[in-house]
Regions:
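Bacterial N-terminal signal peptides
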Residues: 3-14
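Non-catalytic extracellular/lumenal accessory regions of secreted precursors
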Residues: 18-59, 108-109, 159-167
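C-terminal edge strands of extracellular/lumenal beta-sandwich accessory domains
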Residues: 22-33, 61, 89-101, 129-167
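Contiguous segments within soluble domain cores/interaction surfaces
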Residues: 24-27, 75-115
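Residues that act as N-cap/strand-start positions at coil-to-secondary-structure junctions
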Residues: 45, 55-57, 88-90, 124-125
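Solvent-exposed loop and beta-edge segments used for protein-protein assembly and interaction
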Residues: 55-57, 65-67, 86-88, 118, ...
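Hydrophobic beta-strand segments within beta-rich accessory/binding domains
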Residues: 60-85, 138-145
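Beta-sandwich interaction modules
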Residues: 114-133
């Protein structure tokens, strides 16, 4: 009986981190630029930055990386009509500017389904960045390009631990 409990606890120990969810951060109309938006103090901690974007809407936020950290950013939208039927030119434009000023435009190079069990929400992955990061503060800009509101999520980081957000 004790061995079975220890085995179950061991399995639970290894499975629990896989079931963790990104910490939500919701952007609103006050977060029009990265400087006005929140700062994710550690960009390796997993966050889900949410914004509803229509034509002309602008949102921004920042995150920091240290030396040798991995830059991990994913662009998702909620998989619902009519937003999931928009052409790439109608979807929100997302740019990531590194601390050296290099601008990366997230290109729509996939439409991979993802079911998030905690909220019961279906998403579509549209783009992912995964590369060696540069030490310093990154700036993310989000711009709506269609009259259809698009529930947009920028997932940052990969470590499922509690993180700090500064406004």
């Amino acid at each position: 009986m004790v061995a079975a409990f220890a085995c179950a606890m061991g399995v639970g120990f290894f499975v629990a981190p896989l079931a963790s969810a990104h910490q939500p951060v919701n952007l609103n109309e006050r977060d029009r630029t990265p400087a006005q938006g929140p700062l994710l103090v550690d960009g390796t901690v997993s966050f889900a930055v949410n914004a509803d974007l229509s034509r002309g809407d602008k949102r921004g936020f920042r995150f920091q990386l240290e030396k040798n950290d991995t830059l991990a950013v994913q662009l998702l939208i909620v998989d619902q009509k009519p937003a999931n039927q928009l052409r790439p030119s109608q979807l929100p434009r997302i740019t990531v500017t590194d601390p050296n000023g290099k601008v990366i435009r997230m290109k729509f190079n996939e439409r991979t389904n993802f079911f998030e069990p905690y909220s019961g929400t279906n998403y579509l992955y549209l783009s992912r960045l995964n590369e060696r990061g540069v030490q310093g503060t990154y700036k993310v800009r989000m711009t709506g390009r269609d009259s259809t509101p698009v529930k947009t999520v920028i997932a940052v980081g990969y470590r499922e631990v509690r993180g700090e957000v500064r406004n």
